[in-house]
Amino acid sequence: MANEIIIVEGKSDSQKLKKIYGENLITFETNGLGIDDKKLNSIKELSKKNKIIIFTDPDGPGKKIRETIIEFLDVDVFNAFVSKQDIDKNSKKIGLAEASEEAIKKALDNLITYNKKNISISWDEYVKNDFYIKANRIIIANHFNLSEDMSSKSLFKWLNWMNLKVKDIEKIIGE
């Protein structure tokens, strides 16, 4: 994972990834929602020479951190996702550190590129094709290991960031 920096929420996430991939893996810890302008500017500086991979927890704060970073950067951002189902059932936390090694490897092998400049579908297309309906949102969310609780507005934004076209989304729903 040369020239890659994985953005995680905390120390235990970094430790888990380094246990799997070795101590040479480079992570950047946001310290949860404590991500501030200084950290965002550091990430922006790192993005000039490195591939940025966001790998946050599959919960509300993780989603917020991911959106904050994507909105701040002007480059393609790579995203790794684990789902809540990938978390150890005996854990009280819903974090990356509690995910299985297999789920982490799968997530990092299946990165999704986001770019905030992408506009691949319009709101009219989104509504006309019933992508906003909860049942369809759940199918789409599960396909990408996103939260099933994601709002219609957020999903619309994220689908654009992924540069998905109507036919791509229809294919996902039809699977």
Swiss-Prot record:
Binds two Mg(2+) per subunit. Mg(2+) 2 binds at residues 57, 59. GO terms for biological process: rRNA processing. InterPro entries: RNase_M5, RNase_M5_C, TOPRIM_dom. Gene3D superfamilies: 3.40.1360.10. One of its GO terms (molecular function) is ribonuclease M5 activity. It is found in: Cytoplasm. One of its GO terms (cellular component) is cytoplasm. Its cofactor is Mg(2+). Mg(2+) 1 binds at residues 9, 57. It catalyses: Endonucleolytic cleavage of RNA, removing 21 and 42 nucleotides, respectively, from the 5'- and 3'-termini of a 5S-rRNA precursor. Residues 3-83 form the Toprim domain. Its EC number is 3.1.26.8. Keywords: Cytoplasm, Endonuclease, Hydrolase, Magnesium, Metal-binding, Nuclease, Ribosome biogenesis, RNA-binding, rRNA processing, rRNA-binding. SUPFAM superfamilies: Toprim domain (SSF110455). HAMAP family: RNase_M5. Belongs to the ribonuclease M5 family. Required for correct processing of both the 5' and 3' ends of 5S rRNA precursor. Cleaves both sides of a double-stranded region yielding mature 5S rRNA in one step. NCBIfam families: 5S_RNA_mat_M5. This is Ribonuclease M5. It comes from Mesoplasma florum (strain ATCC 33453 / NBRC 100688 / NCTC 11704 / L1). The lineage of its organism: Bacteria, Bacillati, Mycoplasmatota, Mollicutes, Entomoplasmatales. The gene is rnmV.
